[in-house]
A protein has these predicted regions:
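Short, leucine-enriched amphipathic alpha-helices that occur as contiguous helical runs
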Residues: 1-3, 87, 91, 112-113, ...
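Basic, Lys/Arg- and aromatic-enriched nucleic-acid-binding interface segment
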Residues: 1-16, 42, 67
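C-terminal catalytic core of tyrosine-transesterase DNA break-rejoin enzymes
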Residues: 7, 11, 112-136, 143
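Conserved tyrosine-mediated DNA breakage-rejoining catalytic core shared by Y-recombinases
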Residues: 12, 16-17, 21-55
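Active-site/catalytic core of tyrosine-dependent DNA strand-transfer enzymes
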Residues: 50-103
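Catalytic tyrosine of NAD(P)H-dependent dehydrogenase/reductases that use a Tyr as the general acid/base
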Residues: 83, 108-109, 144
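Catalytic-site neighborhood detector that most strongly recognizes the C-terminal catalytic loop/helix
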Residues: 133, 138-158
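C-terminal secondary-structure termini that scaffold catalytic or DNA-interacting sites
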Residues: 159-174
């Protein structure tokens, strides 16, 4: 379960609230996508990476208790077994994994920032990233891009190489 939860945050850019609000019907395995119920009742469709589908299926088939809850992620044991996870439960899950892993700065929202930075490094356009993250203003999306000096240098070098191949720098074309 915890792998699937972090996968939705890290590989789909979901907010913790969006993860705990996921229902089984929101997942389209065949289509490879998930319907997200975002802020202010706005919906968006986000693609599901194959690795995340595998983690999701392991959770459903091996861990998720039988329950009438339509929520995808539920409590696995104890008196609240089968009830939907809460924000508090997500915080406890992350606290537990920080403790056993020694990674002190891992939190749900940092995974969303990592998603934004990784997608940018992979070359996704800013308007596309904005849609995936459920933003209505590109300025908000820019907060998640997290460009580092090396990222800027790499992009600059790619642009220079592109100009060279078009012979603009060499002065033969303008």
């Amino acid at each position: 379960r915890d792998i699937a939860i972090t996968g939705f945050m890290l590989f789909c850019g979901l907010r913790s609230r969006e993860v705990i609000n996921l229902k089984s019907d929101d997942i389209g395995i065949t289509e490879g996508q998930v319907l997200i119920h975002g802020k202010a009742g706005k919906e968006r469709i986000v693609p599901l990476p194959k690795d995340l589908i595998a983690a999701f299926e392991r959770y459903i088939n091996l861990e998720r208790p039988k329950t009438d809850s339509p929520h995808l992620f539920v409590v696995l044991k104890g008196p609240h077994r089968g009830l939907p996870l809460t924000h508090c439960a997500i915080r406890k899950i992350f606290r537990y994994h920080r403790k056993i892993s020694g990674v002190s700065n891992a939190n749900p929202h940092r995974f969303r920032h990592t998603f934004g930075a990784n997608m940018t490094r992979a070359g996704i356009s800013l308007p596309m990233l904005m849609k995936l993250m459920g933003h209505t203003d590109v300025r908000i999306t820019m907060r998640y891009v997290n460009l580092f000096a090396q990222d800027i240098k790499d992009e600059f070098n790619k642009a220079i190489a592109n100009l060279r191949t078009r012979e603009i720098i060499n002065g033969t074309k303008s």
